């Protein structure tokens, strides 16, 4: 069911005159929506994420989404092969960071909602950052905005947790 909806949404966003059009913003929106749904599904079950194996599978899914987004950006903007390879390596490093971050979240006494938001915000920011990197490199303003959003949301979410031993 969910796979069918994902494919239907992808085709609805990308098909124009029976040709798959290159649409960067819509592809980014699709990737973020899929990250949101996957994160909700992953963190909904309290027993789902405590193991390293399951968090690595989540990281592999993040890599698949980020790598496909980077590949679509590379094809759309006709980037050199070396930059495409570098972007793919950046997607892999981002996926490993997300997997480690997710695994670390299970070490903290957080609710499923807090874990989900602490997963989703950095994951969406990393995908957005990869898109800006493919567009010629992020500006200082963009780096500052991404870092501010991450740190601000981290502080707000961790401040809202009832820390009881």
Language-model features, listed with the residues they occupy:
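Final/C-terminal transmembrane alpha-helix of multipass membrane proteins
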Residues: 142-163
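Structural signature of hydrophobic alpha-helical transmembrane segments
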Residues: 1-7, 48-62, 111-122
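Helix-coil boundary and interhelical linker segments in multi-pass alpha-helical membrane proteins
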Residues: 39-52, 102-114, 161-165
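Hydrophobic, aromatic-enriched interface-forming segments
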Residues: 30-74
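C-terminal ends of transmembrane helices
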Residues: 8-23, 65-83, 127-137
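Hydrophobic alpha-helical transmembrane segments
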Residues: 1-6, 29-35, 56-61, 86-103
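Hydrophobic alpha-helical membrane segments
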Residues: 94-98, 115-130
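Hydrophobic alpha-helical segments and helix pairs
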Residues: 1-40
């Amino acid at each position: 069911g969910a796979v069918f909806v994902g494919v239907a949404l992808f085709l609805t966003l990308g098909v124009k005159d029976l040709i798959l059009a290159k649409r960067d913003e819509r592809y980014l929106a699709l990737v973020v929506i899929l990250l949101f749904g996957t994160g909700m599904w992953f963190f909904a079950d309290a027993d789902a994420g405590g193991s390293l194996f399951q968090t690595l599978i989540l990281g592999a899914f993040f890599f698949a989404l980020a790598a496909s987004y980077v590949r679509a950006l590379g094809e759309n903007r006709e980037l050199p092969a070396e930059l495409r390879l570098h972007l793919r390596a950046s997607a892999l490093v981002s996926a490993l960071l997300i997997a480690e971050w997710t695994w670390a979240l299970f070490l903290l006494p957080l609710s499923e909602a807090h874990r989900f938001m602490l997963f989703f915000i950095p994951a969406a920011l990393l995908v957005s950052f990869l898109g800006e990197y493919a567009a010629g490199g992020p500006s200082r303003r963009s780096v500052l905005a991404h870092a501010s959003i991450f740190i601000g949301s981290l502080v707000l979410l961790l401040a809202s947790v009832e820390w009881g031993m």
